[in-house]
């Protein structure tokens, strides 16, 4: 039923893309609820639909355009936001779907709300008490993404994110701490710290000092993590470049303040290709840093992502990448075949790699990594670990995660049937076996 004279206006929402986009969606949804809008999960009952898009690679662009088209077909009133909305100042989306009501870029909640207000005025008497203090979230209650900055100062040749989200803009640390405290009070037991470049947090603010609860707090990733570590929940860091000052986080991991886990987007192992990517090209220094991290924190889990088939990548470059992979022994790895992104400087680099070769290299890469992952997971068999219940599967089977695994992108711990457990519970388990991706265990104590 659509909104009438006495019914609140209803908004449908489709959120695509990365965790940073998820946080943008949550902020918009929270404000909509505060203004009295109802949020619905189907096109038929919505008065207007918002589609938060991704535009990073071709597959994401296609998915976003399809989602916009479906929303137009099923509902007819659509507001588009997100990274794809920033392409060509919105003309790219309008060219494909001229009937959309409005197009905005990422991190533009105000513009999205203005477009919704124009199409569907808010109720005159919003009940702000309908919104929980931690806001509305798209993740399960037991974990939450905590975005600490917008934009990026890097100029990687394969990426157009800076042109979409702009230069680095760090949030004030006291603002982040207030949000984190509200999330924990609302039931979050894990905070996943995200940004485009987490280690660069505070550079734009010149690391100025703020105050939280009367205590000084520097706008610096080490100080922020130390403060988050006092909240008594898992704190997991994503999108961390291997800057030298990341070494300062290791004592916090050793003390149990933050998880011994780093998501480090390395992208390649060949200095020549790294230079073409406009990434730090000293792969041997990165390898030394990884080995140093592991000496300081033996339980450290390192996740990374790589690109194969980058323009100009030769067999020798790919062999260097595999050598790097074997030497680094990373725990969790994702690999993508290079996909040209409209507007990226890498498109002008000569030596395009044929698609079949890209896929062959990707398969070879993942075969090497699978053996490494299997071996590293096997070392945990026989250990006792504290895990977080993530989901209940068919037949009462329990799916959990250890401190080594981020939601959705890493592995899980399969526990079989375990009576009395609920999503969000902590439980101690004994690891009984492992494969290349997941662990298997039995409950020791809840």
Curated annotation (Swiss-Prot):
Residues 378-445 form the TRAM domain. Binds 2 [4Fe-4S] clusters. One cluster is coordinated with 3 cysteines and an exchangeable S-adenosyl-L-methionine. It comes from the Bacteria. Residues 9-121 form the MTTase N-terminal domain. GO terms for biological process: tRNA modification. [4Fe-4S] cluster 2 binds at residues 152, 156, 159. Pfam families: Radical_SAM (PF04055), TRAM_2 (PF18693), UPF0004 (PF00919). [4Fe-4S] cluster 1 binds at residues 18, 54, 83. Its cofactor is [4Fe-4S] cluster. Keywords: 4Fe-4S, Cytoplasm, Iron, Iron-sulfur, Metal-binding, S-adenosyl-L-methionine, Transferase. One of its GO terms (cellular component) is cytosol. The keyword Ubl conjugation does not apply. Residues 138-375 form the Radical SAM core domain. It catalyses: L-aspartate(89)-[ribosomal protein uS12]-hydrogen + (sulfur carrier)-SH + AH2 + 2 S-adenosyl-L-methionine = 3-methylsulfanyl-L-aspartate(89)-[ribosomal protein uS12]-hydrogen + (sulfur carrier)-H + 5'-deoxyadenosine + L-methionine + A + S-adenosyl-L-homocysteine + 2 H(+). The keyword Ubl conjugation does not apply. Its EC number is 2.8.4.4. Catalyzes the methylthiolation of an aspartic acid residue of ribosomal protein uS12. This is Ribosomal protein uS12 methylthiotransferase RimO.
